[in-house]
Amino acid sequence: MSVSGFGFQAPAEDSIAIDAVSGWPALSTGEFRELRRIPEFFSEKAIEDSLNRSVAEIQQQILNYVTGNFVGQASTDTEVPFTLGASLAPNFSAQQISIYRGAVYARSHADLLGYFSAVDQKDAGNNKAQDVDQQHAILAQSNRAVRLLLGLGRAGVHAL
């Protein structure tokens, strides 16, 4: 059993592998919890669901860009700093795997931030606008990481 800072004990749950057989980098709820300092009161299932959503969003974003299947892009010949395998899984370097992991974990962190504030209400005068600002900042981390994977700068006209 682990003790959370909220006065109750949450049973320790086993880490759940995320997207382990697709050819994309494998992730896990335990690693996410450790790297993003996720509170213990979130069940592994809730974290798994969030990570699966984030993985699907980021993979779709990357594949749509690489294959030219997104608004404003007609070419199917987009240059990116990695190759795609036969299953459309990228052949990422170790550095790119780290960047991908950061993109997914930041996106899920932003996704779960609304739950954080609902469960962890601080002082009565807590400013909810601050939570939204934090959520946007964390989501921006994810978007910057995806742009880096695609070989793009921090911002572009098509991102506006």
Set out the residue ranges of the language-model regions.
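Conserved short "hinge" loops at termini or chain/domain junctions
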Residues: 1-83, 144-160
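Short loop/turn elements at secondary-structure junctions
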Residues: 87-160
